[in-house]
């Protein structure tokens, strides 16, 4: 490891020396921060997608998740009314809290602790997103640590060079209650101080069930400063405060059938509170015409806590048993149930993530061939604190469990630190006039220190004094991930691309808890893809399309066992080998590209097919009758579908309008059925924690009208789930969650 680090550092140092030997200063009229500007995906090997702000405004998704759903191979499980929980998956990745992909904002990590607890409970408000990038091919090796399936990067609006602002107000109603969203931003040039922009966003939206209210305020400041003629500094400061009513526990099957919108009946105090502070300093230095150096320093702090009076048990959503409720253990939909005398289960989490990354972009000639090198190094530090306690109704600790060392956290107290180092190298080799070969390699290493101070169950209740149940362990891992991509420009209208690479994902605490992840292996994958982009018919027919075929072979994928005894709802285990074969297709048609009519039709089609298979021989585990019944061993799971991966996903949008004036469109969105356990159980269990999720269709529509006499401000209206389709949005260890019902939103974007 030390030898490899030394070699890389020598390579980096040599580049700096070369730069110093050449011209010291180069005048560049416009310097861009590589991680913050525009559609970079066209410069990345392999399959990529980019959704710009214009398309986002045209589609008017109810949430960011609906925009993400339109990208081939990408899914979004929208179970909270505002996509705050960011359940994104790419090419067969389990979407739960986006733990198996890397999620960024201006290439600063949004996964709370990327190496150990990569959960996401936050994405930027859709109003301040300038674009969305998705990278699925070998180009993701320059990011990480999750490199098996793909990455999603949200790009913020950059500060305007001339004074400009925007006010966005959105009001609407869902079948649960009102929805309100406000956004204001303004930016201008402050001379030598640079261009700066401030944004404020507020969301107050009802979720898909009664008792769910997503409520947050977001404060954002970014600036671009021209330090010299060849240096630029981009600064980002962000504070987000959320105070939502959200029940983590989901339904049982009978509750979903009886009333899919009941939630916690608004009888119980289930809340989610979160404070996020994010800051980054990104410096770009053009050493000369052939060398650019980007350095990014970032720090994220997250403090979130959940207060819950309900939980999912064998028979569905119930009043918690461990908080002294009068109706403890009763289903929330039982007549006369109450939260009298209820305390709370409180689960605070604290995350610190800090990093330093330097990237070099070097243009050179080797053996007479142009080469575009991209190489870099990243250091990252994470500190995580996870606690749980039981409290009284005043939210102060009560109960019989003994406190540890006089502190208040009696049920669970654990912390972890991670020290990570990543090195990467990618080279675009112009092999011929039409062929670019892109070999690359990534080296990942991390060191984990974990301390667990959990108390034994029932400690103090029966006079037991030996309550210590401490564990502590250390873990390190090193892995080398090679890759190779290619791009072949057959002509100006056809491009063939492909590649292969190895990927990895460290075991996450969400897979099994810190105490168990020491027994889980990192996932590793072999990824293959071949794709075609065709624009032959763009000028004459306004038609472009792209298709890609891929295979992902995973080793040691953690999947949910069907062992349904009490208390094992969230346990996962390494399953062995899995194969995910798939085809993605997307097409865009725009009549205005060839027609002289003032009004024209347009359409978008995307479709993804997956064939996800378990390729390991292993006996499944079922119970004899109900969820907590006697466990019996069943048939071999070989060739069963991988849990949580649907075979079919599609979207079709058809619209009509006058460019830059008005448009109307409708969208049909389809998600195929999928299983949630390795046994591929055909029905949903009574607890709602496992089983087969049925397919569904959702129909949306929207319209936009531009006010040309008012700085091109826009009026819009959006209808989501027009036919009020009832469907299951997600299934997890906490039960099942229903999706958003019918919603209507209208508003104005006023430019000034």
Where do the language-model regions lie?
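Extracytoplasmic beta-strand/coil segments of soluble accessory domains associated
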Residues: 65-108
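Conserved C-terminal beta-signal and adjacent last beta-strands/turns
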Residues: 187, 238, 427, 498, ...
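Membrane-embedded beta-barrel scaffold of Gram-negative outer-membrane proteins
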Residues: 284-288, 292-310, 489, 495-499, ...
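Transmembrane beta-barrel wall of Gram-negative outer-membrane proteins
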Residues: 164, 173-204, 208-247, 271-287, ...
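Short acidic/polar hinge/loop motifs at secondary-structure boundaries
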Residues: 108-136
């Amino acid at each position: 490891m030390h030898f490899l680090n030394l070699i890389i550092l020598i390579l980096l140092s040599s580049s700096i020396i070369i730069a110093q030997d050449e011209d010291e200063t180069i005048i560049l009229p416009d310097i861009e921060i590589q991680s913050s500007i525009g559609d970079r995906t066209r410069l990345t090997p392999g399959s990529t997608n980019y959704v710009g702000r214009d398309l986002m405004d045209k589609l008017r998704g109810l949430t960011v998740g609906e925009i993400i759903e339109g990208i081939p191979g990408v899914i979004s499980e929208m179970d909270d009314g505002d996509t705050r929980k960011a359940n994104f998956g790419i090419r067969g990745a389990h979407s739960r809290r986006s733990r198996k992909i890397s999620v960024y904002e201006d290439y600063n990590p949004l996964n709370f602790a990327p190496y150990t607890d990569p959960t996401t409970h936050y994405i930027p408000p859709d109003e301040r997103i300038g674009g969305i990038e998705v990278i699925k091919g070998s180009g993701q090796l320059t990011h990480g640590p999750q490199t098996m399936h793909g990455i999603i990067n949200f790009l913020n609006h950059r500060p305007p060079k001339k004074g400009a602002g925007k006010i966005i107000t959105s009001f609407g109603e869902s079948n649960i209650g009102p929805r309100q969203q406000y956004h204001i931003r303004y930016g201008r040039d402050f001379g030598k101080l640079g261009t700066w922009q401030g944004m404020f966003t507020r969301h107050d939206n009802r979720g898909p069930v009664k008792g769910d209210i997503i409520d947050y305020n977001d404060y954002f400041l970014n600036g671009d400063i021209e330090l010299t003629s060849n240096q630029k500094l981009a600064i980002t400061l962000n504070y987000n405060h959320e105070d939502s009513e959200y029940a983590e526990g989901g339904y049982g099957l009978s509750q979903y059938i009886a009333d899919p919108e009941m939630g916690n009946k608004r009888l119980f105090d289930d809340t989610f509170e979160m404070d996020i502070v994010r800051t980054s300093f990104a410096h770009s230095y053009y050493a000369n015409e052939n060398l650019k150096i980007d350095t990014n320093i970032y720090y994220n702090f997250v403090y979130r806590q959940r207060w819950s009076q309900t939980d999912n048990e064998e028979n569905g959503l119930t009043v918690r048993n461990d908080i002294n409720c009068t109706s403890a253990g009763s289903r929330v939909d039982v007549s006369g149930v109450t939260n009298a005398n209820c305390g709370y289960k409180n689960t605070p989490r604290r995350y610190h993530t800090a990093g330093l990354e330097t990237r070099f972009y070097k243009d050179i000639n080797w053996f007479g061939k142009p080469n575009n090198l991209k190489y870099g190094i990243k250091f990252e530090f994470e500190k995580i604190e996870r606690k749980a306690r039981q409290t009284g109704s005043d939210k102060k600790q009560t109960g019989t469990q003994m406190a540890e060392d006089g502190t208040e956290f009696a049920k669970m107290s654990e912390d972890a630190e991670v020290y990570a180092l990543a090195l990467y190298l990618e080279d675009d080799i112009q092999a011929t006039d039409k062929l670019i070969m892109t070999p690359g390699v990534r080296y990942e290493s991390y060191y984990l220190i974990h301390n667990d101070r959990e108390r034994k169950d029932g400690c103090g209740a029966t006079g037991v004094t030996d309550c210590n149940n401490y564990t502590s362990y250390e873990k390190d891992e090193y892995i080398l991930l090679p890759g190779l991509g290619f791009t072949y420009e057959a002509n100006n209208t056809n491009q063939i691309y492909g590649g292969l690479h190895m990927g990895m994902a460290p075991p996450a605490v969400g897979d099994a808890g810190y105490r168990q992840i020491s027994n889980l292996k990192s996932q590793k994958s072999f990824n293959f893809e071949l794709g075609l982009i065709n624009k032959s018919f763009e000028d004459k027919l306004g038609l472009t399309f792209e298709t890609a075929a891929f295979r992902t072979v995973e080793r040691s994928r953690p999947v949910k066992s069907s062992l349904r005894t009490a208390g094992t709802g969230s346990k996962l285990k390494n399953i062995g080998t899995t194969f995910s074969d798939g085809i993605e297709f997307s097409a865009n048609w725009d009549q205005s590209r060839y027609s002289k009519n003032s009004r024209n039709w347009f359409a978008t089609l995307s479709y993804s097919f997956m064939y996800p298979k378990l390729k390991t021989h292993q006996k499944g585990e079922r119970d004899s009758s109900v969820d907590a019944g006697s466990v019996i061993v069943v048939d071999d799971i070989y060739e069963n579908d991988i849990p949580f991966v649907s075979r079919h996903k599609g979207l079709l949008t058809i619209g009509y309008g006058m460019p830059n004036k008005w448009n109307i469109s409708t969208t049909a969105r389809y998600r195929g059925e999928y299983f949630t356990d390795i046994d591929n159980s055909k029905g949903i269990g009574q607890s709602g924690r496992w089983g087969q999720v049925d397919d569904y269709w959702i129909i949306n529509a929207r319209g936009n009208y531009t006010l040309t006499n008012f700085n091109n401000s826009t009026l819009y209206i959006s209808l989501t789930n027009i036919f009020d389709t009832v469907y299951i949005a997600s299934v997890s260890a906490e039960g099942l969650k229903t999706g958003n019902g019918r919603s209507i939103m209208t508003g104005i974007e006023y430019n000034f």
